[in-house]
């Protein structure tokens, strides 16, 4: 969501804009590269990329590894086989953004945080019926103002307090059924979960991480437990849109510039 303009934009569009701005700077971008190890004391990164293994050192390092989706299926309350027309949020965005495909005309959305409302809005904008949304919670995880914002695009048919549920359909999803027999029919099930920080690299490198929440232990100014290490974006915890992460990173850049002086 691009909050400053009050509209929903595709991630590739926003990333394209950022890439054009970076192209006008001296920023070196290495794609197809993975950080496999960090040495916080030496500010050293071990990289694996098309050219093989290599090491980099820096005066300051920003961890912006984002977050991954923890779905209800991982928590054990959503049972059943993953048949055709069952997808996670990343599948929904891929079908819609990259391929222009509508995965379901009558979708059932499992989950109720901001990710679920964003997926519902994308489905509605692509031409689906109003989604059915179910969750274990009695009220949606997304806050009031977040839900109010998305009412411009979607007003899901909400059902809360679902303690256990299972997928319906042998070869393709035909809906979801609760343990007490309530059915929510549909031609596609979208499983949307909360985000947990991708802090494994920091944990393995010896930086301070709270368990079991995986939250980074931060000092004022988004500084991590080792001097010269900082964090930005969704790795900080919670769910934030791309524009929030952009502004958060821009504020941090000013602090790092001061740190390097």
Role assignments for model-derived ranges:
Residues 89-90, 94-98, 140-147, 167-169, ...:
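Short, charged, surface-exposed secondary-structure boundary motifs
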Residues 74-77, 120-123, 201-204, 243-244:
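Short amphipathic alpha-helical segments
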Residues 11-12, 16-106, 175-179, 190, ...:
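FAD-binding core/adjacent interface of flavoenzyme oxidoreductases
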Residues 69, 113-115, 196, 236:
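Residue-level detector of alpha-helix initiation sites
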């Amino acid at each position: 969501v691009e909050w400053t303009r009050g509209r929903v934009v595709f991630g590739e569009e926003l990333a394209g804009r950022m890439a054009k701005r970076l192209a006008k700077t001296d920023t070196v971008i290495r794609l197809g590269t993975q950080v496999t190890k960090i040495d916080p004391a030496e500010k050293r990164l071990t990289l694996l990329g098309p050219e093989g293994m290599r090491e980099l050192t820096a005066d300051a390092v920003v961890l912006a590894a984002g977050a991954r989706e923890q779905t209800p299926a991982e928590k054990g309350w959503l049972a059943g086989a993953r048949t055709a027309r069952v997808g996670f949020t990343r599948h929904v965005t891929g079908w819609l953004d990259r391929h222009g495909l509508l995965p379901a005309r009558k979708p059932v959305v499992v989950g109720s945080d901001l990710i679920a409302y964003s997926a519902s809005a994308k489905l509605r904008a692509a031409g689906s019926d109003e989604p059915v949304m179910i969750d274990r919670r009695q009220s949606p995880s997304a806050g009031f103002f977040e839900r109010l914002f998305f009412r411009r695009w979607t007003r899901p048919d909400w059902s809360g307090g679902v303690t256990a549920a299972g997928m319906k359909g042998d070869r393709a999803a035909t809906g979801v059924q609760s343990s007490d027999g309530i059915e929510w029919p549909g031609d596609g099930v979208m499983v949307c979960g909360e985000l947990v920080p991708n802090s494994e690299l920091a944990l393995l490198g010896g930086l301070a991480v709270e368990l079991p929440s995986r939250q980074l232990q931060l000092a004022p100014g988004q500084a991590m437990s080792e001097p010269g290490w900082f964090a930005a974006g969704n790795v900080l915890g919670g769910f934030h849109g791309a524009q929030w992460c952009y502004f958060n990173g821009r504020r941090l850049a000013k602090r790092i510039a001061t740190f390097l002086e």
